[in-house]
UniProtKB/Swiss-Prot annotation:
It is a multi-pass membrane protein. It is found in: Cell inner membrane. Pfam families: MarC (PF01914). It comes from Salmonella paratyphi A (strain ATCC 9150 / SARB42). Keywords: Cell inner membrane, Cell membrane, Membrane, Transmembrane, Transmembrane helix. Residues 29-45, 90-118, 176-196 are cytoplasmic. The keyword Magnesium does not apply. Belongs to the UPF0056 (MarC) family. The gene is marC. GO terms for cellular component: plasma membrane. This is UPF0056 inner membrane protein MarC.
Amino acid sequence: MMDLFKAIGLGLVVLLPLANPLTTVALFLGLAGNMNSAERNRQSYMASVYVFAIMMVAYYAGQLVMNTFGISIPGLRIAGGVIVAFIGFRMLFPQQKAHESPEAKSKSEELADEPTANIAFVPLAMPSTAGPGTIAMIISSASTVRHGGEFPDWVIMVAPPIIFLAVAVILWGCLRSSGAIMRLVGKGGIEAISRLMGFLLVCMGVQFIINGVLEIIKTYH
């Protein structure tokens, strides 16, 4: 049982900086300004469902994609590390706010024409929460745990859905409490937390690249 808790804790530590629910909260508040309470709650719930579904598909279909295109685990680690480090760098030194991204601007224009437009999938679930970095990390981690032998087989089967469900529930709770979070933390607090998470992501990405290079050296030495 301790192995299960360890796997869940490790998964949340890896995924939450990438998912970064607080950034999604700021984006949600910017896009849902004209929605009533019931519609906001519906969008929050649907965004969480979409995030869970995207993560599940990435985890279980990722290996199939790798095998189909002949992608090696070291190659995936290096590519995933580059993406994660790049996303972390952008969080550490942001060029634009979350609500200024192309996806958010496009959705804002759509909301101006149709106030009840769906914002749950784009941009809240993807790319804000379950974006390219999150998907790359999930696929890479799936390959690592399946071939690493660090956890028992039953933990590898049970832990991922629990981790993805926990991330989705955390996102749902943050979106439902978005107003209170913004009043408590403020925009400055969210930016500070995002920069800290960005630094962690840069470190994780660099470590992924190092592990990939070392595995290539070990394989072809």
